[in-house]
């Protein structure tokens, strides 16, 4: 579906191009079916290769965050590019989701918990 890797027990999702109304539902279903419903509750969403993101996709991110939070897990956005970071800021999503510059920084935070 989308590029990913699992390091220790952390799922690192690495979508590319766009997250928008055309693929957000598929992305959400895939994340829930392949990871959340199988007990993974630590997920990083790497946004460095995402060229654009729309409000529908932001809603999907919030849904994933709520699910992970309710299970005591850890969710973070990693290395959003400038354009995506601007959208996160304008929508105040950067206030409710942890954002890290690198995967290593996010991994350090997970290990501390």
Swiss-Prot record:
This is Putative anti-sigma factor antagonist TM_1081. Keywords: Phosphoprotein. InterPro entries: Anti-sigma_ant, STAS_dom, STAS_dom_sf. Belongs to the anti-sigma-factor antagonist family. GO terms for molecular function: anti-sigma factor antagonist activity. Residues 1-110 form the STAS domain. The lineage of its organism: Bacteria, Thermotogati, Thermotogota, Thermotogae, Thermotogales. It comes from the Bacteria. Phosphorylated on a serine residue. In the phosphorylated form it could act as an anti-anti-sigma factor that counteracts an anti-sigma factor and thus releases a sigma factor from inhibition. The modification Phosphoserine is found at residue 55. The keyword Flavoprotein does not apply.
């Amino acid at each position: 579906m989308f590029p990913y890797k699992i390091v220790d027990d952390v799922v690192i999702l690495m979508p590319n191009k766009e997250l928008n109304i055309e693929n957000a539902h598929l992305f959400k279903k895939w994340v829930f079916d392949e990871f959340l419903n199988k007990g993974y509750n630590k997920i990083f969403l790497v946004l460095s290769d995402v060229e654009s993101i729309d409000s529908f996709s932001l809603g999907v991110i919030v849904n994933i965050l709520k699910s992970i939070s309710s299970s005591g897990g850890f969710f973070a956005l990693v290395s959003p590019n400038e354009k995506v970071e601007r959208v996160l800021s304008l929508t105040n999503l950067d206030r409710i989701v942890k954002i890290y510059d690198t995967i290593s920084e996010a991994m350090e935070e997970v290990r501390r918990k």
